Structures are given as C-alpha cells and as structure tokens.
Amino acid sequence: MKVKVFRVHGYFEKNGRKFKFTKEYRGIKEEDVKELVYSDIGSKHKVKRNKIFIKEIKEIRPEEAEDIVVRRLSLEL
C-alpha cells in the first residue's frame, strides 16, 4: 500500500450560505480522504455531513501539493 496525495474540491452549506473549499490530504484510497473531509469540515465549521458536498477528489503528485505540510510529509519518504 502506498500513500497518495489527493486534492478535494467542494462546498458546504451553513446558515443558508454556501462556502467553497479546496483541501489536500494524504490517504491510501479516495474513501479514506472523503471520510477525512467530512470529519475535518464538520468539526471545524460545526456542519453536518449531509450539508457537505464534494465535487471532485483528484489524485495529484506530491510536488503539486500547495499545502506545505502535505508536501513535506509526502516528499520526505
């Protein structure tokens, strides 16, 4: 099993407004990353899972990661 880097695009609804997000995570498969998105967005913004909408999950190369923590963790290996 190899850890990959994924970029996630989506939005969530809170108080009748929509907020876009783009996040980068490390994971083995897309399902793991989807679970991380629900957990992260839900806990930070107090939003239920049914109010979080994921438009796209795309695997990217570690060098393309904009999040410095994700990039450094991926390139150290």
From Swiss-Prot:
GO cellular component, one term: ribonucleoprotein complex
UniProtKB keywords: Ribonucleoprotein, Ribosomal protein, RNA-binding, rRNA-binding
Highest taxon listed in the record's lineage: Archaea
Biological process according to GO: translation
Disulfide linkage: none
GO MF terms, alphabetically ordered: large ribosomal subunit rRNA binding; structural constituent of ribosome
Family note: Belongs to the eukaryotic ribosomal protein eL20 family.
Assembly and binders: Part of the 50S ribosomal subunit. Binds 23S rRNA.
NCBIfam families assigned to the protein according to its UniProt record, in alphabetical order: PRK00773.1-1
Designated name of the protein: Large ribosomal subunit protein eL20
Species per Swiss-Prot/TrEMBL record: Pyrococcus furiosus (strain ATCC 43587 / DSM 3638 / JCM 8422 / Vc1)
